[in-house]
Amino acid sequence: IESGTEILDLGTPNDLSKFIASSGYTVHNTKGENLDTDFQPYLDTGVDCITAFEIFEHMLAPFNILSQLKTQKLIASVPLKLWFASAYWNTKDDWDKHYHEFEQKQFDFLLEKSGWVVKDRLIWASPDPKKIGLRPLLRYFTPRYYMVYCERA
């Protein structure tokens, strides 16, 4: 994505969207709306690219917004499902729950069915050296995050 590109980041401002803005891009963020139901204002914004960093796992139906976005480019990341851990679920905050933790093939299928073609992908692990135990050890070797660059089909 060329420097100076105008981007809509689905989600409230975060460290990554701030970094992107500081790198020469114009970044607009959503305002914390429920994007399962209140996504219409963001469908045709005229931006060059949409980013969505770890929001689709929080949505009940990400297909709805993914299939209707009018932009031609999408960069999105999701946490991958871990075989040794259950989905994240904050009992005190309805916005902080993972309704979906995708396998790579599931997220690719969602993107395909909503009209996107994955052009590039990146998968990485996310170890936490401060924690001790079997699960923290497995996080050194098990892919945890998945990011894709897509274009409209």
Regions found by a protein language model. Give the residues of each.
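Hydrophobic anchor at the start of a short beta-strand
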Residues: 7, 27-30, 74, 118-119
